[in-house]
Every structure is written in structure tokens, then in C-alpha cells.
Amino acid sequence: MASKTAALGCLLLCALAARAAADTAPDALARDIFKQLIEINTSHSVGDTTVAAQAMAKRLLDAGFAAADVQVLTGRNPKRGNLVARLRGSGAHKPVLIIGHLDVVEARREDWSTDPFVFTEKDGYFYGRGTQDMKDGDAIAVAALIRMKKEGFVPDRDVILALTADEEGGTDNGVDWLMKNHRDLVDAEFALNPDSGAVWSDNGKPVAFDLEATEKLYADYEITATNPGGHSSLPRADNAIYELAAALGRLEKYPFPFELNPVTRAWLEHMAAAEPAARARDIKAVLRSPASAAAVARLSQDPRYNSTLRTTCVATRLDGGHANNALPQRASAVVNCRILPGHSPEEVRLDLAKIFADPKLQLQWIDTATDQPRDSGPATKAMPPPPPRPELLAALHKVAGEMWPGVPIVSEMETGASDCFYTMAAGMPCYGFSGTAIDRDDVRFHGRDERLRVSAYDQGVVFYYRLLKTLTGG
């Protein structure tokens, strides 16, 4: 009997050791998928998300997915394709939808130390456009579905994956288009979005697991100065470029009002316990009523806190003049805003008009669906947070707790914007989180030399696979 008990104990230990080894060993398939996606240019100017969608479709078909369960769909633009794939489950529960965007922002080779569209491993990091935003999440999701398929795992609900176009801009947003034109293919009880939330780390050590509870609204505005112009040898008292520059200078110096909501207040309460003493004192002073204006100003020097405390608007593009030897007849700029919940794009447009304080300037909201300026913006406000899902929270706490013991799961407001907006607008709750860790002082979304720790990617692969299995009855 003792020998049988010992043998069973040995088998159990061996099984646990095998699982631990599998979870810590680099996943060659997941890395290969990541490399393939990075090296397919999906930027808006010259890229093609259809090529990326087709590449991922082939991966899934080669893994044994039925052709009927893997579709590449395009709308009016053949280069803005979307992948929809389904891992069939038992049907005990309604499906879960995973969303991820295939497109990336522009990247110029001359700005980078490496080629942004060549997957490069260097000094413990993967470099390339999309390594943080968000081809890591795309590759991880594809790898997880392939692994579950090959294992013969049957989830208790269908798992749908939608990898889509134009989240970063453009007029062919894939999630919006699928919700409006192919709802039957993506209909689910709720959605998961690896493009939101993050495991935040310091020098590679995880310190917080952020779960998106709400997000800001995205809005672009065009500000235009016009002038009769003339010969550059005869300067005028008024000048379109100077007038535009003066208005943008006023925006640069204007902080939008400080404002907290229940989600950002709870997040700050957590950060007060996690930050060094001086920063913690400022956070506590901000949480008081009334808040300390000096503490708000100090916290606002950190871009992460500044974007949490207020609506932000920043100039992102400039265009002006038509000849080197002519006075400018027109000068324009694009101002990008991320708007706090409770406020609308039209409200912010009116605020900007007051900030620019020049009635000669034309200020218009840019309709992202058509890329055309409009004289007024919508009254739409950010969606309220989705209701908590006990089964999702239980799975998150279980898997994250096993992988990063002691690291708290904290609800946050996404300070950018994500495709959760479109699922929520369609009545589908959306929850944003990712299992890849990013150092808080090394956030390179949309920036030069975008990179992700190799170890963080490998852990993210393990996390998402285990999370999906736990969530769907594994």
C-alpha cells in the first residue's frame, strides 16, 4: 500500500513538474506567430490587414479548424480585412468573444534603431512595431486557440476570435463593422480585449494587474487659420501660421479641469499604497476633499497620472503654406483629445474654442467614420462600466494569483481608447486585460523602438492560455 501511495505521489509530482516546465518553457509557435505578424506591415498608409488576417487564418486551418469556422471578411476596402475564427464548445454557455486589432500606427525606419517591421530580439527584448500595441495580444490569442484545438479541449462555450482593422484610425473599423454587418458571427455573452489593461512592472517585476473598468472617449479636431496670403517679400500684420501657432500655444499651457470618478478614485487609492512615500503623499492629498491643487500639479507632471486626472488634448499634426516664397493662405493642425467619462466630443469642442480664443479660426470635429470634418461633434459620452462577471473575476484571480502571487488586480480607466467602445455600444459588455508585463517607465505604444521583454511575452502566452481554459471549464 505504501509503495502504491508513493508511486501515486510520484506521478502527481511528475505531472505538476511537467506542467510547470511546459508553462515556463518558451512557446516556439507563439513566438513564430508573433514574428510573422510583426513582419507584415499593417500600418494605415501602406499596410494591409487582409494579408495578416489571411496568415492567421492559414495557421488556424493548418491546426485543424474547420473552414466554416475561419473566415476573412472585408468591407469596402479590400486591404482592411478582418479574421473571425471560432473554437467550438459544448454550448453550455453563450460564447465569449476575444477582440484584437491587426493594424498598427505608422513607423519610420529613420526614427528607429532597428527596422520597425523586422522582428528583432536584442538584449532580452523583442523590437518591432506592434510589440506592445498589440500584435503580442493577437499572436497570444491565436496560439492559445491552436493549443486548445490540438489538445482536443472542448470549452463549455464557443470561443470566438476577431482580429480586425482600423482600430488605430481610418474609416473601416473592423469591430464596428462586424457588429453592424456580421453580428451572427461575433455574437457573444461578453467580450475580452487584450488591448486594454496591463500587468505593470518595475524592472521586469510585476507590481499591479490592471483590469479595464471604463475608458476615455477618442476625438480628433481640426483647427484651421486662413489668410489672403501674398508675396513673402511683403509680410502682412496677420499670418495664418502665426495665428495657428498662437492658438496651439494657448492649448499647450491649458490643463483641463481635474476630475475623479469612482474607477479612477479606486485606482488612486491602490496606487497610494504602492508608490514611494513622496508620491503616495501627493496621491492621498489629491484624494482629499477638497483636493490639494499643488499635489494635483505635481502628479500631473507624470503623463500616466495626468491622463488619469483629466481630459487631455494635444496637437498631433501640422500642415501649412503652399510655397516657400509665398505668405501662407492656410495653416491647419489636428488636435487629438481623450475625453473623461461624463463629457462629450461636442462639449470639448466648445472648450477648445474658448481656449484658442480666436473667432477667426475654424474649429471642427473630425468624423472618424468618414475622416471628414464636421462643424459640431456628437453628444455621445463614454459608456458606463460593464457589470462585474463573477466567473471572469474568479478565473483572473486564480490564474494571476498563481503566476504573480501577491500582485493585486486593480480596476482602471483606460486613458486611451479601445474597440471595447464598439462592443459596448452594441450591447455587449467588454473587459480589458492583458497578461504581458510592461515596465511603467518603458511604455512605448506608438513610439520609436517599441519593444517588449522576451520574458514578459512568454509569461503572457502562458497566462492567456490558462485563463481561457479556466474561464471555459478547463
Predicted segments, located by residue:
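Solvent-exposed, acidic/flexible segments
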Residues: 23-31, 42-53, 78, 131-134, ...
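Sec-exported extracytoplasmic/periplasmic mature domains
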Residues: 35-42, 57-66, 143-150, 180-183, ...
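Solvent-exposed loop/turn segments at secondary-structure junctions
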Residues: 42-45, 76-78, 89-92, 102-106, ...
